[in-house]
């Protein structure tokens, strides 16, 4: 297998950022368009949904269909570190709160309930998918941190499985951790997921129950 030239990883990272930026611009345009014919809040929420869906499409398009050798390089391109993880979590939380506000204002409007539910689901899935990409990057970067059952090298689906397990149960299952750094990362993920699930989803369920 031929080695990559030094400039190639940088070009790949630039292309990845260009794709992310294109999704953000598209989302902003949709937000402005919807906001001009509806409320600014609804426009902002729908704009976030478009941005998040574009980023989800990028993650799964680039990572979900490749073997472990290609996955190692692409995960490094997609993952932008803890700052991006933090930014995604904050944006997802704000968008979800905005969706809850839309639901409260809409009262019994089915469209408002549907928009709020879809937004929270998209935000939740994006948060854990970004963590899955980060887990994949850390795993292939260090060669340790996670131990997967079986003899085959993990694909991206295994990292999504691990991220969703942590995000829904706040613990690991048959995939185990074997480094202090990975345990700290898993703990951070579990705490963030617990906070999101407890505050955002609990409020949403309570409001939906009161409106039915």
Where do the language-model regions lie?
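Membrane-water interface of transmembrane alpha-helices
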Residues: 55-68, 129-141
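Juxtamembrane helix-capping/reentrant segments at transmembrane boundaries
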Residues: 71-91
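Membrane-proximal soluble regions of multi-pass membrane proteins
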Residues: 139, 144-179
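Interfacial loop-to-transmembrane junctions
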Residues: 176-195
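Loop-to-helix transition at the N-terminal end of transmembrane alpha-helices
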Residues: 40-57
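Membrane-helix interface/capping segments
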Residues: 60-78, 100-104
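The first (N-terminal) embedded transmembrane alpha-helix
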Residues: 13-36, 94, 197
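Helix-coil boundary and interhelical linker segments in multi-pass alpha-helical membrane proteins
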Residues: 30-43, 101-115, 208-212
